[in-house]
């Protein structure tokens, strides 16, 4: 009987889990044991939350002055400003020179002659009455324009011994024609004519008798034949001073 009981107790002891001495209640506690050895490092934990924003720091000291930048593009033009006040009246300037308008005039007559002139050629009026500017040539009987503008020319002719027809000619082209019949009267007759014409520098004007028998221009002591012309107005806006 005893051997059987001993085997039973031995089996129970081997099949039960070992008991921790520290967990067995005891009426008389013992002294604390020695500290155990440190354990191994554990795995890294989860990241923590962001911390709160800190307070603004104090302003820093001013930095050094930087280099100047490139000039910018010109801006748009501004609106005109208000009109300023009138300035003081200036001093009176020196007196200027009076300008003289351009001049051109002449008058000439034929010398006494009883010989008829040739036809279709310039008729000279060789005795100059006025030619201050020298624009008329008494040798050729031609007027040469020096001042551009409008001119008036006139011819007063004595008609005797034959009928007379003459032209005012500009550069070889007739600009006006005049005629006087002579009927064998005992005294001379007269023929006058004139015209206005625009001339440019170097244009020429003269008198020319007609063809055939119409060459009865005459001159004597008491019966003159004259050719005259003068500038009516100039085309120059700013004319120089002419003597």
Curated annotation (Swiss-Prot):
GO MF term (any one): identical protein binding
Keywords (A to Z) from UniProt: Collagen, Secreted, Signal
SMART domains given in the database record: C1Q (SM00110)
Name recorded for this polypeptide: Complement C1q tumor necrosis factor-related protein 5
Pfam family, one: C1q
Gene behind the chain: C1qtnf5
UniProt-listed GO biological process terms: inner ear development; protein secretion
Superkingdom to which the source organism belongs: Eukaryota
Subunit annotation: Homotrimer (via collagen-like domain). May form higher order oligomers by supercoiling of the trimers. May interact with ERFE.
